[in-house]
């Protein structure tokens, strides 16, 4: 922890095409080896696929998908008297979006389609329809929190 107080949050610039900070954060999350241009191309192509398949604005579909992925509760390990308890805690808004974006990208990468554009587009569409691996991850996280409700009084 820093001695000079809390570290200031770095603000990302909105992306040029959709003028959204969320999209920029997704681009940054997908980026490998600093290749931001490639990451942008992949995302914009994925959004084109989403527009093609749904006929809706891709930003709306993406925001709905993210809303369906973002967790409300998670468990954190807390050591009490030599035993580790999984204590359910509420997820802060900033962490919610971060986890949502992380899960979206990770589970898109694990999909079987040929290109990353198709994988990402399909994962976004699945998440928007409340199906898919990233939504299952959120459900599992909530289930864990529900199962460990008894330890909620250990919250800090």
Swiss-Prot record:
GO terms for molecular function: rRNA binding; structural constituent of ribosome; tRNA binding. This is Small ribosomal subunit protein uS7. The gene is rpsG. Signal peptide: none annotated. Part of the 30S ribosomal subunit. Contacts proteins S9 and S11. One of its GO terms (cellular component) is small ribosomal subunit. Transmembrane segments: none annotated. The keyword rRNA-binding applies. One of its GO terms (biological process) is translation. NCBIfam families: rpsG_bact. Keywords: Ribonucleoprotein, Ribosomal protein, RNA-binding, rRNA-binding, tRNA-binding. The keyword tRNA-binding applies. One of the primary rRNA binding proteins, it binds directly to 16S rRNA where it nucleates assembly of the head domain of the 30S subunit. Is located at the subunit interface close to the decoding center, probably blocks exit of the E-site tRNA. Belongs to the universal ribosomal protein uS7 family. The lineage of its organism: Bacteria, Bacillati, Bacillota, Bacilli, Bacillales. HAMAP family: Ribosomal_uS7_B.
